[in-house]
Amino acid sequence: MALLSAMKLQGRPPPISSNLNPNSKPAGSDSVSLNASEPGSERKPRKFSSQLNRWNRARTLRSGAKLDSTITNGSNNTTGPMRPIESSSRTDVSTLDSDVSSSSNGVSEADMTAAKSIYIVSDGTGWTAEHAVNAALGQFDYCLVDRGCPVNTHLFSGIEDGEKLMEIIKQAAREGAMVIYTLADPSMAEATMRACKLWKIPSLDILGPITESISSHLGTNPSGLSRGITNSSLNEDYFKRIEAIEFTIKHDDGALPENLEKADIVLVGVSRTGKTPLSTYLAQKGYKVSNVPIVNGVDLPKTLFEIDPRKVFGLMINPLVLQGIREARAKSLGLGSSFKTKYSELGSVKEELELAKKIFAENPTWPVIEVTESAIEETAAVVLRLYDERQSNRAMPRISKSY
């Protein structure tokens, strides 16, 4: 008890076992073990690096590779996706109730509160649910990192068998996890909802309400087939994405300027404004993208000013941020001091950005997007919104013309 009190005062939950086997011993046995070594030998909480910002730390915690792990299984940390337990072949919800209730007694209250888990279950790739969960967790970074309430997410994809589904839900009940699911098969979704309600598991169906609303709006029933699984047929969209990716790779960093007319989107900006990763992201959505660098002393290709201006987008960034990015880039490449001065010196950076502003001012039909504090996904969303508006000759209402 004294040891537990000391650990609570330090703000650290006691270590717990990750053994979730239905036959695990009750609390108080070997399934929950406390370190009874001398206080001086206790592991001190790891201090976070000043180089690691809150967002990255939170994502590290959510991925399961915790910065200060408290969940142990023997001597090994539990990392990576968890797998369903192999204990029962029964799939009926009502007959599994007693099994879960009896085995959950082997997990103590401390086990349930030390770390929170979210199970993501999908009959496809799980991409939709996983990204929705990560987006929502982004609202809790202040708690996940600084207030010591880490959350682990575990993805179970390709779950099309009722037996496997029930095993996952049983495991979630034992661990006290939340279940978030996208199951296209109505019977699977219904079974999940009933099981979670029976065992008092917090759960959320991401796909169901949206599908029902669209079904009502269209006046037709959904197919109930999952999308994005590995054995899905290769359709036109798949080959369109492959073609777009191949095109984008070949036309990176100003290559083959004679083909700019063939691109759906053309990105223009100075070095290290994120043109290449943004191009790749857009290509994965099926858009052929070329990007053209703005460099002092190098003329832009004439074809850039001859193509449809509705497909051209400029990228702008804060000079201090750009300088930091370039310094890190030069250091990683082991470049000489003379190149570093020309490439990452603040005066040179500002000079290039002034040149970019001048070019953008001379071409007012090109939207200029500020990328300093934007993630690739956020910038891509702005590009695609503007692209759609310009291609369809319609403008969506917006609060500001600042992108």
From Swiss-Prot:
Effect of R326M: Weak interaction with PPDK, and loss of phosphotransferase and kinase activities
Bias (Low complexity): 17-26, 69-80, 87-108
Impact upon substituting K275M: Weak interaction with PPDK, and loss of phosphotransferase and kinase activities
Tissue-specific expression: Expressed in green tissues.
Effect noted on mutating E352Q: Weak interaction with PPDK, and loss of phosphotransferase and kinase activities
Compartment(s) where it occurs, according to its Swiss-Prot or TrEMBL record: Plastid, Chloroplast stroma
Name of the top EC class for this enzyme: transferase
UniProt transit peptide range: 1-86
Outcome following mutation: T379V: No effect on phosphotransferase and kinase activities
Gene Ontology molecular functions: ATP binding; phosphoprotein phosphatase activity; phosphotransferase activity, phosphate group as acceptor; protein kinase activity; protein serine/threonine kinase activity
Keywords: Chloroplast, Kinase, Nucleotide-binding, Plastid, Serine/threonine-protein kinase, Transferase, Transit peptide
Phenotype for N291A: No effect on the interaction with PPDK, but loss of phosphotransferase and kinase activities
Family: Belongs to the pyruvate, phosphate/water dikinase regulatory protein family. PDRP subfamily.
Note: The initial 51 amino acids are sufficient to act as a chloroplast transit peptide and the removal of the next 35 amino acids reduces the strength of interaction with PPDK significantly, which suggested that these residues are important for binding RP1 and may not be part of the transit peptide.
HAMAP family assigned: PDRP (MF_00921)
Name this protein carries in UniProt: Pyruvate, phosphate dikinase regulatory protein 1, chloroplastic
Organism per entry: Arabidopsis thaliana (Mouse-ear cress)
Phylogenetic lineage: Eukaryota, Viridiplantae, Streptophyta, Embryophyta, Tracheophyta
